[in-house]
Amino acid sequence: MKKNTKQTKDDKMKKPKQHPKQKGFRMGLRAKILGISLPITIIMVIAMIAIAYSVSEKDIMKSSQSLLRTSAKDQGNQIEAWLNRKLDEVKTVKYDLEHSGAVKDQKLLQKKLNDYYALDDSFVGGFYVTDTAGTVMKADDNTTQINNAKDQIWYQKGLTRMNPGYTPVFEDAENHMMISACGMLDDATNIRILSTNLSLDSVNIIVNSSVSMQGAESLLVDKSTGDILASRESELIATSLKDTSNGFLKNVADKINKDDESVTTIRDKVVVTREIAGTDWVLVSYVPTSLITSEVDNLRTILIGVAIVGLLVFTLLN
């Protein structure tokens, strides 16, 4: 009896052998489940990656557009501040000439012009005083020859105002982009124009080096003529958007003509424009779209890598 009882216990402890058909059935069921769940999982992962990429791209694009607009605003403020500062200096010189008696004393006037010659490097050649006969007074150290003074833009514009203001941009004899600040002197006995020429080199420096957004670039355009006044690419300066064969610049010209200051995407660049107060100038700032989305592209690559690893683990575990 004891022997039979022991045998019964041993029989109970023995695992029943699976029938080959049962084993095949279970493997087939697992394969079917995996065949259904794996595609669904892959679709879900792809959808999640696409959603994450889209949301991240929109957020980064929005943030970058705001940063580009801020950068253009800061540059525009710097250009306007420079123009206002130089114009204030011209007004100070005008006030000094009028209230020191220099407008009625030729010797004192000549001395003043000599003193102001080295006032500021931005004032190319110092200051000029031109009468209605076309006679020009200038600093003794200024060797520039001025012919047909009455035909010069600074003379013609100066006749229209007492308070000094800027002329449109013009090229000097050496093909440098210049502007003049000019206005009539307060002299009851003689009509005379006070003027000075300013180089746009300082403006060019602001346009090229004061971009706060990494990877962004700017150029300054005269809206009335389409001429490029400042650019990091020196070969573009003094060329016209109206004559360009560059597709991007053509689209920029259209944007300027429409007075469109919104942030827009032109070809492969995000672009914003800003008008410079008191001038016909428009600052154009732009950044490659690829530079903005590069961080999102890196995130997408990481997500895809994680997804692939996760799918492999999921497949192996099932």
Where are these regions (language model features)?
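Extracytoplasmic/periplasmic sensory segments of membrane signal-transduction proteins
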Residues: 16-19, 66-165, 210
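Extracytoplasmic/periplasmic sensor domains and loops in membrane signaling proteins
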Residues: 107-111, 140-171, 234-263
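Solvent-exposed, extracytoplasmic
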Residues: 106-121, 193-236
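Juxtamembrane interface helices immediately C-terminal to a transmembrane segment
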Residues: 34-35, 52-82, 101, 105, ...
